[in-house]
């Protein structure tokens, strides 16, 4: 029996690793599945664990008020030392580009335990964009014994870095496995759908605003209103870039009074402060009240994964600086405009599901306007094939680990 330890600490990692935990757990005669979480994103991590019904075997609980990257790295590294000595896994699986993943991979390397890197080979080739994620994934990739690349391009990136071809398996992205699991769960449970609708109302947005004659329509053109879903929290955008993003969103909300703009606000004060500077009077609004003359700009509380997918499924398009959403939203047929200057997911650019708009005010306004005004342009993006997989990435990873 192989001992497989999966280590993660943030909400995006948890979403992408949760279906893999489930996949290994289906073979108790072959694998002892060990889950270690670091708590790098404490509250949001716990929400995902609850959704997928995962109870960690180890919880480092590293989150402290005001900690920086030095603190996170050192706490994960020291915490993993004792966990690895006790559990003695045969392989440690980490995900992507977080500080948790890099520190956990380094800890495993120090004990000469093989590391499997899920979502390996993504590159922007600029170590400061995104920061620190680009360097994190490059370091983790150097440590990894096994590389699970989501696409042929990410495999090519690794080969160009002289990574052994035998160590690389193209699997698709596990985020699509998670997305399909959640969408099926929501669609198959009317009570859950009603509960998520209530959760959104409590967070500050009433999805009935999108209905026609009291009925929810899946066709954007049949709705009385359309929805632009917004997320933004990247460190490299803090400062002038983030102010430009916020100003563009404000101007779009004023330009399109018949479109709702919904922004679940990240807990980070570096995100909330500039939003309150650009959207004057925001702090005076009551729950569920939209900002602006048309009352169509909604800043709501952060959403757990189920609620976010529920809202994303109802959206017309997504405006984001997130990495994972570039993979998820096209799986639901939603065009994505990325408020970053680079992306480690060029496959989406090539496929036409994603477009870079940076943090430039005019470019953001122009591209959102084009998607809202030009039906043919919208259809070209929304109907493009998602390059990130078929929902069977976890199965491929499990089969690889079985065979080693």
Model-identified regions with their sequence ranges:
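Nucleotide-activated sugar donor-binding and catalytic core shared by glycosyltransferases
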Residues: 1-263, 270-404
